[in-house]
Amino acid sequence: MAQTDSTLLDAEFLAQHTSGLEEFDGWVHGLGWSEIEETSGLPRSDLESVARIYATAKRVIGVYGMGLTQHVHGAKSIGMLINLLLMRGNLGRPGAGICPVRGHSNVQGQRTVGISEKPELVPLDTLARQFGFEPPRDTGMTTIEVVQGLLDGRVKAFLSLGGNFARAIPDQGRADPVWSGLALNVQIATRLNRSHTLVGDGAWLLPCLVRGEEDHQSGGPQAVTIEDSLSHIHGSIGRRPPAADTLLSELAIIAGIAKAALPPNPAVHWDKWVGDYGLVRDLIADTYPELFTGFNDRMFQPGGFYKGNPVRDRVWKTTSGKAGFTTPASLSALDNVPGSGVCSLITLRSNDQFNTTTYGFRDRLRGLEGNRNIVLMAPAGIAAAGLRAGQKVALRSTHADGYTRRLGGLTLTPYDLPDGCVGAYYPEANVLVPLGLHDLDSKTPAYKGSPVRVVPDPN
């Protein structure tokens, strides 16, 4: 469309605010429609219909989630979505932009205050000045690297702030046996889960307060903060009585461990910080003054306070000072295009599921109910494979790394999926996701696109 109507592109925005368009344009024009249709699973007519909608929309927000990120080329997929927004100037103006969907109340907020495996993203010099110590500057571990470290014995201790790590990770079948060999496994949690049972002798389960429970410390009732998906930071006060008088807050547990494990430091006041969380927020404001000045005063303003986003003001934090177009090496987000008889596995969550926790067995979003031990497949694909709806089948990984991965006892269920794709529920299907399949940039596990075969299950 842009070939025939130059007004579809925001030429002024592209010239002033972007770089790399020429390279990306050359890559796009090197593609053929047959390749695009085969890779996407969509006909040209459908793609052009969607393109017309986008081209005529005055304001567009690109919303994405794990369907884009959890691929071998997931980061490049997000880059392609940003490319689409850049072409019509849909960044940095009202009613437009890009919005990742995040479920947990602080999955973004913890990054904002420097929790990262990448030392270059943490203000280490500031922390050294504040607290009179030399912080470690070694690169930490991603999820993939932690699991690999468990398998090869490099990881000796594990401390989890909530979550169900052992069920959320890929390659559970390989990882499950090694948990019992850890010298130390500390789980700080609000409810029991499977990870708490895969332990050895040096294991501690420390229950803590949930955010909705009253948190009384020596300084009185305490509040915490969360950051939402749109970068607004809100205060939160628990209103329910704690489940037990003996419960400690996460902050109290972490500070208690640190106080017992580390030598005294006159610049570090663990007990005071536990007694008054406002003092911790003051330290955050001192560490990030451009974001958190007046933190305690602003946290309860209606709607929360806006953290800010340079892109909103068309300020690009890149080496070129401009927004860069992404030119991928491959059209497909997959590691390899599946061969004959091989399907790409999509791990799914039901609408009554939050992360690894399943609250019910009615997946109303997909019109499914009951057993979660199912595999979804297009009716035409079922027929082509010589299978039948309702048949018991198994999924068998075809990833060639020397390990056997199989999930059986699944009911074959017809569903409107693209040809060559099958769907199964997360985390049950994580046993089929190889540890070696992950995004090449972020190392996010490839919970989408793992290669599998659907075979009859005689058992």
Show which residues each predicted segment covers.
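Long, low-complexity segments enriched in small/aliphatic residues
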Residues: K272-R364
